[in-house]
UniProtKB/Swiss-Prot annotation:
It comes from the Bacteria. This is Beta-porphyranase A. Substrate binds at H53, K76, W78, K87, H114, N151, H235, E279, S326, W331. Cleaves the sulfated polysaccharide porphyran at the (1->4) linkages between beta-D-galactopyranose and alpha-L-galactopyranose-6-sulfate, forming mostly the disaccharide alpha-L-galactopyranose-6-sulfate-(1->3)-beta-D-galactose. Some longer oligosaccharides of even number of residues are also observed. Inactive on the non-sulfated agarose portion of the porphyran backbone. Can also use methylated galactoses. Residues 599-701 form the CBM-cenC domain. Belongs to the glycosyl hydrolase 86 family. Coiled coil: none annotated. The active site is at E152 (proton donor), E279 (nucleophile).
Amino acid sequence: MSYKYIFLLSAFTLGVPPGIYCQGRNEVVVDYNTRRFLSGVSELDRSKYFNIHSTSDDDKDVGKFLADYQVGLGRKFWGPYSYAYNKTHEVGKYPQMKPYSGNISVKRYIATEHPYVQHIQGGIDVQAAGAWSAEYYSNSELVPEFFEPLNEPFVHANDAGFTVQGQAMRELMVDFYASIGKHIHNNPRLNGKMKVIGYAAAYPAWEDGNFNYWNTRMKMFIDRAGAYMDGFSVHLYDGINVTGTDTKRSGSNSEAVLDMVEAYSYIKFGHVKPLAISEFGGIDNSKPDDSYDDISSVRSVSSFNHFLFNLMERQDNLFISIPFVSDKAEWHITAANNYTSYSAALFIPDNPQNLKNTTWRLNDKKYFFELWKNVKGERVDITSSNPDIQVQAFKDGGRLYIALDNLDDNPQTVYLNNKNSWKDVSNVTKRSLYVNYNAGIEYTEQNVPSMPESISIVPNQTIVLVADVSSSAFTNSIIRNKYYSSEYLKPISAGSSLSFPFTGIESGSGRASLRMSIGRPVSASKKPVVKINGTAVSVPDNWKGYGQSNRNIFFGMIEVPFDIQLLKNGDNNVDITFSDGGGHVSSMILQVEKYTVSTLQNGTFSEGLSAWQPLGNYGTVCVQTDNAGNNVACISGHAGLMQRVDMESGRTYRFSADVKTEGACKLKVMLQDMSTGTVYTEEFSSPGNYKAVSFDFNSTVKKVVCAIVCERQNDAAWIDNIVLLPQN
């Protein structure tokens, strides 16, 4: 590998051209020749996302659905404490298990139990309770992969019947968890087979009470039981789950919720323990009960998709996630419930008063699974200029999947870009799922002749584009790593700088961003001065999801992109300063995405001239922005721009850019070895209008790349969207 350089030289004018790449537009860029990794993981693991709350794979209808849609089992309410109470009818008293010394099989689902007085009570011996769970499972032929001992326990800490109430009851519940984890891990027949997770937080409003809720719930749980847990479980809902206010967690709030757990896990244990999202979705409060309705019961599907995009970015640190969809839920279809189905049910009976003689049909929740049916493969590099447009992309051999989700409250137009202009993409199918609040789910599949230049997407709509692609091989990789600070939950004082150190950073060619999570009054500033190793960077005015104006406290993650060249290998520091006081910075995480084969940096000039070195004594170089927010490089006279690039010898590279020229100006692109003078040259011109230009060349040892625009002093040229990538 050798160092290469790019130069851009041209003429300059004060006129601002209409750009073809507009920062004010929703730009989604897909590079399906670059494989994307989350740490060491690239392939989509469907078993972590597409599950239902059922273990009834032996049911004919359920089994067919699981097979047809590639869906897994999720969660079941049954475990050692339900079994014990059925035998002894006394909480804290456990029966003698029949010894079993045969092989233990593991089934992938979560076993959990209700926080009832039959299972836990003040005064119980938590060590005996933990020992019983290990005895129960070690003498079972089949065990669940995950055990979440109590479902949403803390919101029931004041329930009638408990002899201990409030925080004392929550601490007892945590010690109950810790004992279970300790005894299961210490049992040689279970250790390595079962994972204990908790605490199944129903209401993860960490910011409440100036983060007292965090300190007395999840932090307390991690401090007292975290060492015995394999992972931490949280429930994510839009709407009200048991308690709280009717707000949206999808978007920046859920990002901040999970980032805080990860950040403290790193501080406490030196590594991040995995997450389990054992329930997620949306809760509709328009009905007084939990009975099924064709309209209100399917509104949760938009939330399924909103949260799913968040969780897909966490696969490397995720055990499992389960949208809140059950199977037939026959337990709910009783005379007491007027023979209605459960709101979360996926199957509806034609003859509810005689379940032994009925036909079951899938309701419209099936379209969530239809939308994602057969989506699989390796992640590919995809970016969105608007955080409200969530994106994912995968390639499975010659099949490409591009997924878009709209978190915004308004319709959006998304422009789809690809460095090859989609030339090797064909047979495009557009899958669309839209949740109409008053009419239910509208699902369509449409064949389109080619990849659309732009696509419209309304609120609560998710689109999956499925296409054939002839270039099935990957020519580059981009690896995303997260780095966690030793500091978190720092109070904000007006004008006082907060410092967050990071160690072990590996920088390079690629992208970088700061995941800044804050909890402060909704009227307070969300735009501090942020410095990366002493250099100030721009903080955006937009973040994922809504503005949280219906909350007293804004709690959300704001992603701050910056030039990766501001990072150093090794130790780095982030400093932030707010102009006003109040609230906390809850977590700060550095996200670095690094190419294995180096590429040009800041080819869209979104960060001004950063990463580019101006050249020449007889001209001027600058970046100008038009009224629509389009950034382009403007170069005058005998001047230019240079950027060093790492390239590999023996590979074919493609240089591409969008160029506009005036007068007799020509774009001259030179590939030059600075030590030997070896030169490869191409010339292009595009008077008056932007034109996409490109060429391929073979790299040799110590070759240097130079891009030069004409040296005429009285003409003008603009350049944007510069890309240099290997093709083999």
